[in-house]
From Swiss-Prot:
<comment type="similarity">
    <text>Belongs to the transferase hexapeptide repeat family. LpxD subfamily.</text>
</comment>
<dbReference type="InterPro" id="IPR007691">
    <property type="entry name" value="LpxD"/>
</dbReference>
<keyword id="KW-0443">Lipid metabolism</keyword>
<comment type="function">
    <text>Catalyzes the N-acylation of UDP-3-O-acylglucosamine using 3-hydroxyacyl-ACP as the acyl donor. Is involved in the biosynthesis of lipid A, a phosphorylated glycolipid that anchors the lipopolysaccharide to the outer membrane of the cell.</text>
</comment>
<dbReference type="GO" id="GO:0009245">
    <property type="term" value="P:lipid A biosynthetic process"/>
</dbReference>
<dbReference type="InterPro" id="IPR001451">
    <property type="entry name" value="Hexapep"/>
</dbReference>
<dbReference type="GO" id="GO:0016020">
    <property type="term" value="C:membrane"/>
</dbReference>
<keyword id="KW-0441">Lipid A biosynthesis</keyword>
<comment type="subunit">
    <text>Homotrimer.</text>
</comment>
<keyword id="KW-0012">Acyltransferase</keyword>
<dbReference type="Pfam" id="PF00132">
    <property type="entry name" value="Hexapep"/>
</dbReference>
<keyword id="KW-0808">Transferase</keyword>
<dbReference type="InterPro" id="IPR011004">
    <property type="entry name" value="Trimer_LpxA-like_sf"/>
</dbReference>
<dbReference type="GO" id="GO:0016410">
    <property type="term" value="F:N-acyltransferase activity"/>
</dbReference>
<dbReference type="InterPro" id="IPR018357">
    <property type="entry name" value="Hexapep_transf_CS"/>
</dbReference>
<protein>
    <recommendedName>
        <fullName>UDP-3-O-acylglucosamine N-acyltransferase</fullName>
        <ecNumber>2.3.1.191</ecNumber>
    </recommendedName>
</protein>
<dbReference type="InterPro" id="IPR020573">
    <property type="entry name" value="UDP_GlcNAc_AcTrfase_non-rep"/>
</dbReference>
Length: 363
């Protein structure tokens, strides 16, 4: 696969200069780029390494003096990471899944398979499942009964889609993703110590030890268009209503979404984030890595949570939060600074106590 500088610039909607017919076969960091690779030197700090590599062409920032860098051609990207999105889409070689349906795949006769669908080895497709046209299903996947998968889906190896799940177009699931497991719902015959402790903020009361009884999941999972889930990501079925993820949302590796939770459009949930059950998350919310969200709360549109935040109460729209418990980021910074001063403050207090308690000459 090779592209000319002209083709790449046109695809990216970017300006280019120099030998626009020069072709490249891949991309690389500036210091590692070979003769036929496009160097990614999108800011001056990266361009310094161009001399260590052999690239003849590079993606640079607007106005860069490309000829002084010894290049034969250059593409100018106003927004580098957006250019990366387009470039990597052009150069992605894929995962090598063969076209057609592998002979070892087990497909129920009542399943509906769209046109140009590829299904890998040892994949199982359940009764009445529907797979949209142009989808690619990798090896060892499971698509449960009555599940619906939209057009252009891309399931990597060992992905499972539970029964009755409904998923929109262009869904992408990385290896080991699990959509539609049962929710983590259990109850005791009488009020438990955990319930008392939560209600009283620490007192278990007289609750006795009891066994847990399972609450079955009658709901399913409903996912919109253009959603992506990372490796080993899990999304649980709803108890009665469906667990929902809106159009364009992206879930990183090891993200967990609990039963009944509803996530809006274009949200970003970073690695190891855990969302408890029955949470309402608005649109365009960003939860940094290892964020924890307690159950039965609301997070408004446009909220951003710093990595490691623990969200224990409702968050109004547009707020930037951080910490455990999560508070406004500027307040968290003030608290952190105050904590850093505590040892010195305690030493000062100790010294003052000694000074005022020491008898004076007149005493």
């Amino acid at each position: 696969m090779s592209y000319s500088i002209s083709q790449i610039a046109k695809a990216l909607g970017a300006e280019a200069a120099g030998n626009l017919d020069l072709t490249v076969t891949g991309a690389a960091e500036p210091g590692d780029a070979g003769h036929d690779q496009l160097a990614l030197a999108m800011s001056p700090k990266y361009a310094e390494a161009l001399a260590k590599g052999g690239a003849r062409a590079a993606i640079l920032w607007p106005g860069a003096a490309w000829q002084a860098m010894g290049l034969e051609a250059a593409i100018f990207a106003a927004r580098p990471r957006l250019a990366m999105a387009g470039l990597t889409a052009m150069l992605d070689p894929g995962q090598g899944v063969a076209s057609g349906i592998h002979p070892s795949a087990v497909i129920d006769p009542s399943a509906e398979i769209g046109a140009d669908v590829s299904i890998g080895p040892l994949t199982v497709v359940g009764a009445r499942a529907r797979i949209g046209a142009g989808s690619v299903i990798g090896p060892h996947c499971v698509i449960g009964m009555d599940a619906v998968l939209g057009e252009g889906a891309w399931l990597r190896e060992m992905v499972s889609i539970g029964a009755r799940a409904t998923i929109g177009a262009r869904f992408i699931a990385q290896p080991g993703a699990r959509i539609g497991g049962d929710g983590f719902s259990f109850v005791t015959p009488e009020v438990s110590g955990a319930e008392n402790a939560r209600k009283t903020m620490g007192d278990q009361g007289e609750a006795k030890a009891q066994a847990w009884t399972r609450i079955h999941s009658l709901g399913a999972v409903e996912i919109g268009d253009d959603v992506e889930v990372g490796a080993n990501c899990t999304v649980d079925n709803g108890t009665i209503r469906n667990t929902c993820i809106g159009d364009g949302s992206k879930l990183d590796n090891l993200v967990h979404v609990g039963h009944n939770t509803r996530i809006g459009r274009d949200c970003l949930l970073c690695g190891q984030t855990g969302v408890s059950g029955s949470v309402e998350i608005g649109n365009n919310v960003v939860l940094g890595g290892q964020t924890g969200v307690v159950d039965n709360i609301y997070i408004g549109d446009g909220v951003i949570a710093g990595g490691g935040s623990k969200i224990l109460s409702n968050v109004p729209a547009g707020r930037v939060i951080m910490g455990y418990p999560a508070v406004k980021m500027d307040l968290h910074t003030e608290i952190y600074k105050a904590q850093r001063r505590l040892p010195r403050l305690l030493r000062d207090i100790s010294a003052l106590k000694k000074a005022v308690s020491k008898p004076g000459p007149s005493e």
